[in-house]
Amino acid sequence: MSTAPKSQPVSADPVHVDSKHYTIDAENDRVRVIRARYGPREKSVMHGHPSLVAVFLSSNNGRFTFPDGRTEERSWKAGESMIMPAEEHLPENLSDNPLEVVLIELK
Protein backbone atom coordinates (compact mmCIF):
# COMPACT_ATOMS: atom_id res chain seq x y z
CA MET A 1 0.00 0.00 0.00
CA SER A 2 1.37 3.42 -0.94
CA THR A 3 1.99 5.99 1.79
CA ALA A 4 1.54 8.92 -0.61
CA PRO A 5 -1.54 11.09 -0.21
CA LYS A 6 -4.13 10.43 -2.91
CA SER A 7 -3.95 14.03 -4.12
CA GLN A 8 -0.38 13.84 -5.47
CA PRO A 9 1.73 11.41 -7.47
CA VAL A 10 4.19 9.17 -5.60
CA SER A 11 7.07 10.66 -7.62
CA ALA A 12 6.51 14.06 -5.94
CA ASP A 13 5.99 12.62 -2.44
CA PRO A 14 8.72 13.97 -0.12
CA VAL A 15 8.91 10.69 1.82
CA HIS A 16 9.77 8.85 -1.42
CA VAL A 17 12.02 11.41 -3.12
CA ASP A 18 13.79 12.72 0.03
CA SER A 19 13.69 10.12 2.79
CA LYS A 20 16.81 11.72 4.31
CA HIS A 21 14.70 14.66 5.48
CA TYR A 22 11.10 13.32 5.64
CA THR A 23 9.64 10.47 7.71
CA ILE A 24 6.07 9.42 8.44
CA ASP A 25 5.08 9.70 12.12
CA ALA A 26 1.44 8.57 11.69
CA GLU A 27 -1.12 8.02 8.95
CA ASN A 28 -4.74 7.04 8.48
CA ASP A 29 -7.31 7.48 5.71
CA ARG A 30 -7.79 11.21 6.52
CA VAL A 31 -4.38 12.61 7.48
CA ARG A 32 -0.68 11.86 7.27
CA VAL A 33 1.77 13.28 9.82
CA ILE A 34 5.27 13.83 8.47
CA ARG A 35 8.33 14.99 10.38
CA ALA A 36 10.85 17.02 8.40
CA ARG A 37 14.39 17.46 9.72
CA TYR A 38 17.06 19.49 7.93
CA GLY A 39 20.59 20.16 9.07
CA PRO A 40 22.05 23.67 8.84
CA ARG A 41 22.04 24.97 5.24
CA GLU A 42 20.60 21.70 3.85
CA LYS A 43 18.12 21.62 0.99
CA SER A 44 15.67 19.08 -0.38
CA VAL A 45 14.59 18.22 -3.91
CA MET A 46 11.47 19.37 -5.75
CA HIS A 47 8.41 17.68 -4.25
CA GLY A 48 4.79 18.39 -3.43
CA HIS A 49 2.37 18.44 -0.51
CA PRO A 50 -1.41 18.54 -0.35
CA SER A 51 -2.97 21.20 1.91
CA LEU A 52 -1.45 20.91 5.36
CA VAL A 53 -0.89 22.34 8.80
CA ALA A 54 2.78 22.98 9.66
CA VAL A 55 3.91 23.06 13.30
CA PHE A 56 7.42 24.45 13.64
CA LEU A 57 9.61 22.92 16.35
CA SER A 58 12.57 25.22 15.65
CA SER A 59 13.09 28.85 14.65
CA ASN A 60 14.56 29.17 11.16
CA ASN A 61 14.71 31.01 7.87
CA GLY A 62 14.10 29.13 4.66
CA ARG A 63 13.92 29.57 0.92
CA PHE A 64 11.36 27.85 -1.28
CA THR A 65 11.99 27.46 -5.00
CA PHE A 66 8.91 26.72 -7.10
CA PRO A 67 8.63 24.80 -10.39
CA ASP A 68 8.47 28.05 -12.39
CA GLY A 69 11.84 29.19 -10.91
CA ARG A 70 10.30 31.75 -8.57
CA THR A 71 11.75 31.83 -5.03
CA GLU A 72 10.29 32.98 -1.73
CA GLU A 73 12.01 33.39 1.63
CA ARG A 74 10.03 32.56 4.75
CA SER A 75 10.77 32.79 8.48
CA TRP A 76 9.11 31.06 11.41
CA LYS A 77 9.57 30.67 15.15
CA ALA A 78 9.47 27.52 17.28
CA GLY A 79 5.91 26.88 18.42
CA GLU A 80 4.28 28.65 15.47
CA SER A 81 1.80 26.86 13.27
CA MET A 82 0.36 27.80 9.90
CA ILE A 83 -2.09 26.47 7.36
CA MET A 84 -0.46 26.01 3.96
CA PRO A 85 -2.11 25.39 0.59
CA ALA A 86 -1.12 22.49 -1.65
CA GLU A 87 2.09 23.33 -3.49
CA GLU A 88 5.20 21.97 -5.14
CA HIS A 89 8.51 23.37 -3.94
CA LEU A 90 12.17 22.78 -3.19
CA PRO A 91 12.83 23.93 0.39
CA GLU A 92 16.19 25.01 1.77
CA ASN A 93 17.20 25.73 5.38
CA LEU A 94 19.04 29.07 5.29
CA SER A 95 19.86 28.92 9.02
CA ASP A 96 23.00 27.75 10.78
CA ASN A 97 20.74 25.70 13.08
CA PRO A 98 18.83 22.47 12.43
CA LEU A 99 15.24 22.82 11.22
CA GLU A 100 12.44 20.56 12.47
CA VAL A 101 8.76 20.81 11.52
CA VAL A 102 5.75 18.52 11.80
CA LEU A 103 3.54 18.54 8.69
CA ILE A 104 -0.06 17.37 9.04
CA GLU A 105 -1.20 16.65 5.49
CA LEU A 106 -4.92 16.50 4.75
CA LYS A 107 -6.11 13.77 2.39
Regions found by a protein language model. Give the residues of each.
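Short, surface-exposed coil-to-beta transition loops
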Residues: P50, A86-E87
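Structural motif
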Residues: N60-R63, E88, P98
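Glycine- and acidic-residue-biased ligand/ion/polar-headgroup-sensing regions
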Residues: H49-D68
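Short, flexible beta-strand-to-coil junctions
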Residues: L57, L106-K107
